[in-house]
Curated annotation (Swiss-Prot):
Catalytic activity line of the entry: 2 catechol + O2 = 2 1,2-benzoquinone + 2 H2O
Binding-site list for Cu cation A: 179, 197, 206
Record: transit peptide: 1-87
Name listed for the protein in its UniProt record: Polyphenol oxidase E, chloroplastic
Disulfide bond residue pairs: 98-114, 113-180
Family statement: Belongs to the tyrosinase family.
Enzyme class: oxidoreductase
Subcellular locations according to the entry: Plastid, Chloroplast thylakoid lumen
Role, per record: Catalyzes the oxidation of mono- and o-diphenols to o-diquinones.
Natural source organism: Solanum lycopersicum
Amino acid sequence: MSSSSSITTTLPLCTNKSLSSSFTTTNSSLLSKPSQLFLHGRRNQSFKVSCNANNVDKNPDAVDRRNVLLGLGGLYGAANLAPLATAAPIPPPDLKSCGTAHVKEGVDVIYSCCPPVPDDIDSVPYYKFPSMTKLRIRPPAHAADEEYVAKYQLATSRMRELDKDPFDPLGFKQQANIHCAYCNGAYKVGGKELQVHFSWLFFPFHRWYLYFYERILGSLINDPTFALPYWNWDHPKGMRIPPMFDREGSSLYDEKRNQNHRNGTIIDLGHFGKEVDTPQLQIMTNNLTLMYRQMVTNAPCPSQFFGAAYPLGSEPSPGQGTIENIPHTPVHIWTGDKPRQKNGEDMGNFYSAGLDPIFYCHHANVDRMWNEWKLIGGKRRDLTDKDWLNSEFFFYDENRNPYRVKVRDCLDSKKMGFDYAPMPTPWRNFKPIRKSSSGKVNTASIAPVSKVFPLAKLDRAISFSITRPASSRTTQEKNEQEEILTFNKISYDDRNYVRFDVFLNVDKTVNADELDKAEFAGSYTSLPHVHGSNTNHVTSLTFKLAITELLEDIGLEDEDTIAVTLVPKAGGEEVSIESVEIKLEDC
């Protein structure tokens, strides 16, 4: 039996607990919410922090004046107040009001995903990086030697042993619960649910998450140089579950994985929950094509790579970036045990994903893509919006000390003390050049976009023609503005897997299983998740595809009107789209 199989019976049905260095439970008292039990404890250790802004951050931009207005200098009390009229960065969540996480409508996570609450919650300091003598180098998982594997297994075993005290913030389940709390409706900020996916928070949140997880593992084996491995799924040699995670009885093994995808099965980076009989070579080819599209074609600018802006007061899940969309989500779906688990546990659902050790290996490679993307050049650089830079999260470090962290402090992995062992990136040179058709599709024979949208359901392949805002643009114009194919108000049931593919200059007879064609523009995917305040579970967001390079490759730069085809792969009968347009956006 796997270690994750007993989760529902070993974790207590409570909301949160004060942190004690001895982890001793004392008397209980009720929270303001009658249905929630709050267990108090006393810490023998303490920390001191000045709330003076000069001691918070030496960076002049670190203390945003709007944060002061929100009372964030005194920390969490203002997190649940109604939002101000102007935007502001997302504050750390209010741990004292952490509530029930949800699997889906009417189904709550049966254990608390909330972390223990420190006694000095209103004085939690900002994290400062400790001094270091050498970088921690994260290796590709498939190439790890047995000495490394043994060390990683030992560290994970010791982390699992800490689950004997379910309130130990360093325990494996408490670490997994971080993802559950931030992603399944347990937290609210500004009166709205906090969600760290489907927006520009995706990359920085997960980078900080792995940073502390990695340091905890290292501390448990007394090795400050220990580094997490990365699942090198963007290289053909790494396109399978790394062997170290596929050993039954190991602390790195999880029973709740798709058993059809073990023993060296090639991963499909575009997986959408259904098994497709595709030759291995074609899967690998599709994978490299997807990587090129997501890292190069569709992400020439920061906004496309990181995702939509998500300031305080805005609705959660405004729109995901290219890598979060694919391959991040399909890897979750492919690994999770959808055939045997109702909700695709473990990797196939946000609330349970952290219960599989491979989650952290997967996200290490996702994080590596952040570094690789900036190396491609052009305008691929970090965002500069202060609402992004000053957004904050809450974590415990390896010494069980609580800290606040800012996005601005995680932009350079080397400054954080880690880097990635280099591996070839063959996808960089994998631009699809082979065309499905020899000429231009007759757009006059295809219904115009105004006759197709709004679309009630994407239950079959559809084609439409659409007019571009400008044609025959100069190189300078292309450098200044990216041409964006924009799908407005895509709505669907967020409890289901969703994917559809987008093609240009082909009709609905296109072979959508072969993605290594110049006309393939990109895909939209979604992992099941829940908005706690959204009782009808309908997600509505915008999906954007950068198409400037694509139009050049297909030879459509001078065309005023182009053909677009959408091919549903999963959940299309639940997908509606209000409108589609092409816009020019500053890069």
